[in-house]
Amino acid sequence: MHEITLLQGLSLAALVFVLGIDFWLEALFLFRPIIVCTLTGAILGDIQTGLITGGLTELAFAGLTPAGGVQPPNPIMAGLMTTVIAWSTGVDAKTAIGLGLPFSLLMQYVILFFYSAFSLFMTKADKCAKEADTAAFSRLNWTTMLIVASAYAVIAFLCTYLAQGAMQALVKAMPAWLTHGFEVAGGILPAVGFGLLLRVMFKAQYIPYLIAGFLFVCYIQVSNLLPVAVLGAGFAVYEFFNAKSRQQAQPQPVASKNEEEDYSNGI
């Protein structure tokens, strides 16, 4: 087991502060678990653990997308706490995903609370828009955004630094069957996330590629999944150019003029 130092705790809080702004704006998508876990691992001095937890957590959250006011479990806290738990307690990445999910749900409800609370600012925002006061409108947006980012930082610091002793004690006290249950649940979550993604993106014409990838992984001995990813990228590029060439080969529809146009109105 490892101890998180005060400097590491503050660094993680600062990281999550920036990622919270990115999540609120959905600007650079740095809040995705694969990036959050990698950066967290770099701060903790174990990039390999960050990459492993990032890959698993990203798959688990691949199909979870906000829709309107509905918020899925928070990807930032999921990535952060999965890596922190795996590094500080020594459990494997699959178990860490299951243990990190409650922190993700906690942040999900905090974000939903902010969605409701910030409705109080709408009267002020409408007034600024009506008066074309762009400076005040900008300050209002920055105020709400910084409140959310600060909440991210405070919760991250409390969960990673102040609560690490209790977290390690909890992991030690868990019986083997419960730890194995979290490991099984964590192993299933990436499959569930990928299944949710396929519900949106899957098309019947791509079934051969799915079968080819499955056979490649199961029956061809490779040390890692990088060859499969490269093969998938090749298929994607092929489909892109193939679809583009088919689109260019289609004849362009020509508008027929069955009756003489009237230009009496000048148009």
Curated annotation (Swiss-Prot):
* Short name of any one Pfam family annotated for the protein: EII-Sor
UniProt entry tagged with the keyword Cell membrane: yes
- Looking at the UniProt entry, the stretches that span the membrane are 11-31, 34-54, 67-87, 95-115, 142-162, 178-198, 210-230
A single Gene Ontology biological process assigned to it is: phosphoenolpyruvate-dependent sugar phosphotransferase system
Q: Is this entry keyworded Zinc-finger?
A: no
Topological relation to the membrane, as annotated: Multi-pass membrane protein
The alphabetized UniProt keywords are:
Cell inner membrane, Cell membrane, Membrane, Phosphotransferase system, Sugar transport, Transmembrane, Transmembrane helix, Transport
Where, subcellularly, is it found? Cell inner membrane
Instruction: Detail the disulphide connectivity of this chain as listed in its UniProt entry.
Output: none
Q: Which residues lie on this side of the membrane: Cytoplasmic?
A: 32-33, 88-94, 163-177, 231-267
Q: Which residues lie on this side of the membrane: Periplasmic?
A: 1-10, 55-66, 116-141, 199-209
The UniProt entry's GO CC annotations, sorted and at most eight, read: plasma membrane
In this chain the PTS EIIC type-4 domain maps to 1-237
According to its UniProt entry, the function of this protein is described as:
The phosphoenolpyruvate-dependent sugar phosphotransferase system (PTS), a major carbohydrate active -transport system, catalyzes the phosphorylation of incoming sugar substrates concomitant with their translocation across the cell membrane. This system is involved in N-acetylgalactosamine transport.
UniProt remark on domains: The EIIC domain forms the PTS system translocation channel and contains the specific substrate-binding site.
The protein's matches in NCBIfam families, at most eight in alphabetical order, are given as:
EII-Sor, PRK09757.1
According to UniProt, the name of this protein is N-acetylgalactosamine permease IIC component 1
Source species? Escherichia coli (strain K12)
The lineage is: Bacteria, Pseudomonadati, Pseudomonadota, Gammaproteobacteria, Enterobacterales
